[in-house]
């Protein structure tokens, strides 16, 4: 009788262990969620507003290093703006960034000096500004094309 009970418990324990070993944890798909509490405007050559963007501000080293890494989605009218202490050549990459982005480099006088359109997610390729920049604006891919934003335009923060 004890033998049958012992064997029964072993069988139950074995089945339970096998059942748990095939269960896989789903990776979190949430990602980071941002608050877009600031706004900026893109201006045409006459100073008219072409588009307005809500944005999360990254103005310290930790925020700039984190950027949009692990952000899985953004509203169409939202992005992130990186503020640097000095105007100098900048270079970004897409490491750990699941979204395709438009990256706009902006000089200290608020002129867009270069734009990278529809960047490749997770890429470690360097995307240099080419000219000195004090600000970098990241938006969803296609934002600059759909809003007719071009190099030489001004940004009003």
Predicted features along the sequence, with ranges:
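C-terminal motif of bacterial Sec signal peptides marking the signal peptidase cleavage site
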Residues: 14-17
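Sec-dependent signal peptide recognition
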Residues: 2-8
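Compact, glycine-rich, soluble single-domain proteins
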Residues: 19-157
């Amino acid at each position: 009788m004890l033998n049958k009970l012992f064997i029964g418990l072993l069988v139950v324990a074995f089945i339970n262990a096998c059942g748990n070993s095939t269960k896989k944890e789903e990776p979190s798909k949430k990602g980071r969620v941002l608050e877009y509490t600031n706004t900026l405007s893109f201006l045409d050559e006459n100073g008219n507003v072409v588009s307005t963007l809500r944005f999360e501000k990254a103005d310290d080293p930790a925020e700039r290093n984190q950027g949009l890494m692990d952000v899985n989605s953004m509203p169409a009218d939202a992005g992130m703006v990186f503020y640097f202490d000095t105007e100098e050549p900048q270079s970004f990459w897409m490491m750990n960034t699941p979204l395709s982005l438009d990256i706009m480099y902006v000089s200290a006088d608020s002129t867009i000096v270069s734009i990278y359109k529809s960047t490749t997610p997770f890429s470690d390729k360097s995307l240099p500004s080419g000219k000195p920049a004090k600000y970098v604006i990241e938006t969803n891919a296609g934002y600059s094309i759909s809003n007719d934003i071009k190099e030489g335009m001004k940004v009003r923060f």
